[in-house]
Amino acid sequence: MEKNVRFYVCKTCGNVIGLIHGNPAMLRCCGQEMQLLEANTEDAAVEKHVPVYERVEDEIVVKVGEVEHPMEKDHYIMWIAEVSDNKTTRVRLFPEQSTETRLPYEKGATLYAYCNKHGLWKTTIE
């Protein structure tokens, strides 16, 4: 089930993967086990990292942070993902781009945002 997706990071090169099903002990990169990412646990400004959204009919307009996250070359949101019971939608972002994107409204889905410096952040769509 997609809703149970877990994200892992390589502490050496920064690769991130989403594990939908399987044994996380099998996940290796750069010769070492990948580490589970725990959302909302980094010591960083919550108001700049937690995804926020506004419902517009059958979509949501998502951005990262009540105060929009900076999108600089050395500090930016790499991607936003919406994970529901049966699918994951991921939008890749780039430095100097806005974090704003539109996704389908999926009540109960989880929105994730991944900051290249401060890790994984999430919120639930109501």
Predicted regions and their residues:
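Short cysteine-rich clusters marking metal-coordination/redox-active sites
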Residues: 10-13, 29, 115
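Exposed aromatic-hydrophobic patches
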Residues: 62-64, 98-106
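Residues immediately within or flanking Cys/His clusters that coordinate Zn2+
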Residues: 7, 26, 112
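Cys/His-rich microdomains that often coordinate metals
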Residues: 17, 33-34, 119
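Short amphipathic, basic-aromatic surface patches that mediate peripheral association
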Residues: 64-72
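Cysteine-rich micro-motifs
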Residues: 23-33
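Intrinsically disordered, low-complexity linker/tail regions enriched in polar/charged residues
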Residues: 1-5, 12, 19
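Edge beta-strands of extracellular beta-sandwich domains
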Residues: 117-126
